Structures are given as C-alpha cells and as structure tokens.
C-alpha cells in the first residue's frame, strides 16, 4: 500500500487528479484565474467572475452564492488584490464541497450500492471501486444486480476479472434484490469486507425505482444484520448541469448518500463538481479521471482545489 498524503490520498492519486483536471484547469478555470490575477477588486470584477463561474458549469445559483461569499470574505479580511481574492475563492470553494460525514463503511460487510442511468460509466465505476478498495487491502465481492440487461452482467464479469475479484450473478430477469441478498450472505459467511452491487440503469418510473431500491436495502439487512449501506449515484461530468437536473428526482427516489462523478478528464468546464453538493445535497465521493482501472480516485475538496486553483502565495 502506498503511504497516504496530506489530503487522504497518495502521490499517485494526486498526479492522476492533476492530469485529469488538465482541461478544466487550462479552460474556464484558467480564465477565472486570469481575471482575478492583477485586477483590483470592484463590482465589475465580481460581475465578470460570476459570469465566468456560470460558463465553467458551476450553475447560476451556485455562482451567485460563491461570489457573495467572496464579497463578504474580502470585506471581513480587508483584502485588496485579485491574488488575495483568488486564494479566498479557493478556500470558499473547498468549504462549499466539504462532506459533513465520512462514508459509512464500518459494516460486516460494508455494502456499496451503485446506481445511475445507462451510459454514465456505472459498470466501469464499480470495477474501479473494486480495484481501489482491493488496493486498500479489502476483500471485495461484486453483485451483478442489473439483471434487466443481459450485457450488464457479462460486462461486469469481464471487469471483475480485471480487478481480480469474485462476482455473484444470476440469469437475466432475476430479481436484483435476490442477487444482492445472495452476494451479501455469501460475503458475510466467507469473511469478505465489502460488497459492491450494480443495479438497473433503467426503471420506468420513480415508484418502480423506489420499490426496487427499498427491496434491495431490506435484503441487505436480512442477509447480514451487521451490514452498512452506502448508495452512490454515478453522474457524467461532461453533461454537467444537465446531469445534475436529471439526478435530482433520481436522488430523492433512491435515497442516495453520495456521488461518483465520471469523465472529469473529458471536460474543460468541471465546475459541476462544485455544484453537485449545493444542488443535490450530496457529497462527491469519487471522481473518474481516465479510462484505466485505477483512474477512479477518492475526492477531497482540498486536493481538488489544490489542482484547480494553485495558491498564489499571497497572504490574506
């Protein structure tokens, strides 16, 4: 295992985050930094900053909130230069994204349910999570709970092989809750630390989704009363604000506890990371920064802003 760094992950993760955020850092966020650097702080600057935050896919309401917080910080601390304002904005953004709690992974086993519409990178995210936790020394088992799509189980099985973890699957059309029940029971009996479960990516309406997921959550507790349960929703960073709007209903119905944001390396905007917690009320737990199996990394607000908005070194 690699030693963990200052922000809860090692140098490898830090480098991956740096590379994965290259487009975002040099794109809109680069122009935000250029706007602030060398500027005097006045209303024009705030207006321009608000506009650029919206272009960076932060969303209107979040952009206004960030700029208002910056105005307050500038006044409170008597900041004079754009460089000082940039450092202050960096801290405000990190605060905005900070989760209130850690992930609940203390159960026997710890169960992570992964949900999301088809096409966002759900299956690959599950394999990458399995790889990540295996590298942390955990014994991981996968549950092929997306039984509505024949290809889903096969795809997950291939990825499970790459991650070197066992998988429990059933025939097409089997009840997802039953597959997940069998997996959790088997994992508990065999001393596995964690079960990561796939779920259907298309359910026709909200009540179907709620029924399916509450069945799954009951089956987890029935299979192993000491299990803990996290439900992570996978979102595609490239579709940004659209993804967040679509996810609102899904989150409520699914009782999600956190977000996996994929394809962050494929967008120059990347501001939707900042908007997710504000708009969905859920913390980002992992970000996808590439195609490789080890390209899903734990998200930390400090690590993120460190790479996105390098400190100018000005005191404030």
Regions found by a protein language model. Name each.
Residues 6-8, 27, 125, 298, ...:
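Intrinsic disorder/low-structure terminal segments
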Residues 12-16, 119, 147, 209-213, ...:
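Short acidic/polar alpha-helix capping motifs at helix-coil junctions
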Residues 2, 315-316:
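C-terminal accessory "lid"/substrate-recognition subdomains
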Residues 18, 23-147, 152-188, 192-197:
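Primarily NTPase-proximal linker/entry elements flanking Walker-type ATP/GTP-binding cores
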Residues 4-6, 43, 130, 296, ...:
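Generic intrinsically disordered, low-complexity segments enriched for polar/acidic and small residues
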Residues 175-190, 204-315:
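Conserved catalytic-core segment of NTP-binding enzymes
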Residues 1-29:
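N-terminal accessory targeting/assembly segments
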Residues 200-202:
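Short glycine-rich anion-binding loops that position phosphate/pyrophosphate groups of nucleotides
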């Amino acid at each position: 295992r690699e030693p963990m760094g200052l922000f809860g992950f090692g140098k490898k993760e830090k480098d991956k985050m740096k590379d994965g955020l290259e487009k975002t850092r040099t794109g809109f966020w680069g122009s935000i930094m250029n706007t602030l650097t060398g500027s005097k702080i006045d209303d024009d600057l705030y207006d321009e900053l608000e506009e650029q935050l919206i272009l960076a896919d932060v969303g209107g309401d979040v952009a206004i909130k960030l700029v208002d917080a910056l105005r307050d910080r500038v006044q409170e601390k008597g900041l004079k230069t754009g460089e000082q304002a940039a450092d202050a904005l960096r801290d405000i953004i990190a605060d905005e994204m900070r989760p209130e709690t850690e992930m609940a992974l203390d159960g026997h086993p710890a169960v992570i349910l992964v949900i999301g519409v088809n096409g966002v990178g759900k299956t690959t995210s599950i394999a990458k999570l399995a790889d990540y936790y295996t590298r942390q020394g955990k014994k991981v088992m996968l549950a092929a709970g997306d039984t509505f799509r024949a290809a889903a189980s096969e795809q997950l099985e291939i990825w499970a092989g790459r991650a070197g973890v066992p998988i429990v699957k059933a025939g097409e059309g089997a009840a997802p809750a039953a597959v997940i029940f069998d997996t959790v029971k088997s994992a508990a009996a065999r001393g596995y630390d964690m079960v990561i479960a796939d779920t259907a990516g298309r359910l026709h309406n909200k009540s179907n989704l709620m029924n399916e997921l509450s069945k799954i959550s009951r089956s987890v507790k029935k299979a192993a009363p000491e299990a803990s349960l996290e439900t992570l929703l996978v979102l595609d960073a490239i579709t940004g604000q659209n993804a967040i709007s679509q996810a609102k209903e899904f989150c409520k119905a699914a009782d999600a506890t956190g977000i996996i944001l994929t394809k962050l390396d494929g967008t120059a905007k990347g501001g939707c990371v900042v908007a997710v917690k504000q708009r969905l009320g859920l913390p980002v737990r992992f970000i996808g920064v590439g195609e490789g199996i080890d390209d899903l990394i734990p998200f930390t607000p400090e690590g993120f802003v460190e790479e996105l908005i390098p400190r100018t070194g000005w005191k404030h």
